[in-house]
């Protein structure tokens, strides 16, 4: 069974984790700190099975997490800063159980089944309550649909209402998709707490940011529209119009790493509406699963799994 439910890419595109439709977890790529969870530090240019009964996986820099269907959270990889949440600073080459009662995770925060957002690498300290979904980083959607940036060390910050997806741009701005599929640009930490931002487009259901310049760290964006067409957002012109570059049709989900749109500095994945997984960009670490660590593709190519 090769259908994919979700994919996450870590380490700047150096490794990838895929949850298949049978809830098995597969990994591929570089493995110098055990980030594949295979029990060794040997990398793989073919996908290898790591564990079963997984509902969600999240990849960090050189570490990763998985939530199992029984609500347990598992962690592996680099742990020099205690980022795995296991109470040690010892790297883990195989998954270790670090928490119970978990509904979701990203690379830094876990969401409990009772709606608490916990910072994994900070002793599972509570960052927020009443959370419905966690997005990337510190962004969270509350049970009332409001979008917040949450933190253990700092005050939680309200961003806007009626959100279904959002991402930050690294410059204190946030792209938000609302329940009516409108796309908004909102200034975070604005002194004008009455402003909900500026509506810039309509007809989208997911948005994500990705790094497009290693030196400056400037972000780019990708959009999935209501018709399941995946686009790069190149820029917004002076009249507020989106300048888009289509990537693929019939896409249900995606994962992006560092990239410049016109060259080969990124590794990306998308899953079509039938569950087929595709990769594009660079294959320098073998994450295309083709058995080699070379090559580049401007267009999505099929990712295969061993029988």
Name each model-derived stretch:
Residues 1-307:
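Eukaryote-biased RCC1-like beta-propeller repeat architecture
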């Amino acid at each position: 069974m090769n259908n994919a439910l979700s994919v996450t890419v870590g380490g700047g595109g150096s490794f990838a984790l895929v949850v298949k439709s049978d809830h098995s977890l597969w990994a591929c790529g570089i493995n110098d700190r055990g980030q594949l969870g295979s029990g060794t530090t040997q990398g793989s240019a073919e996908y290898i099975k790591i564990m079963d009964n997984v509902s969600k996986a999240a990849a960090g820099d050189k570490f990763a997490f998985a939530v199992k269907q029984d609500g347990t959270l598992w962690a592996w990889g680099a742990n020099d800063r205690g980022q795995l949440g296991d109470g040690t600073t010892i790297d883990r080459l195989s998954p270790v159980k670090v928490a119970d009662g978990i509904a979701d995770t990203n690379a830094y925060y876990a969401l409990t089944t009772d709606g608490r957002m916990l910072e994994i690498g900070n002793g599972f300290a509570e960052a927020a309550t009443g959370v419905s979904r966690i997005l990337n980083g510190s962004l969270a959607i509350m049970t009332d649909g409001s979008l917040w940036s949450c933190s253990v060390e700092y005050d939680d910050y309200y961003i806007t209402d009626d959100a279904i997806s959002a991402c930050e741009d690294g410059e204190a701005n946030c792209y938000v998709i609302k329940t009516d599929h409108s796309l908004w640009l909102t200034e975070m930490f604005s002194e004008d707490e009455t402003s909900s931002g500026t509506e810039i487009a309509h007809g989208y259901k997911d948005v994500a940011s990705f790094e497009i310049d290693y030196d400056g760290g400037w972000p780019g964006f990708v959009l999935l529209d209501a018709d399941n067409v995946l686009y790069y957002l190149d820029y917004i012109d002076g009249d507020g119009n989106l300048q888009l570059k289509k990537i693929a049709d019939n896409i249900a989900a995606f994962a992006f790493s560092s990239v410049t749109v016109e060259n080969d500095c990124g590794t990306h994945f998308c899953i079509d509406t039938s569950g087929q997984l595709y990769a594009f960009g660079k294959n320098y670490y073998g994450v295309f699963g083709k058995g080699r660590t070379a090559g580049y593709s401007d267009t999505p190519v099929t990712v295969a799994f061993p029988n």
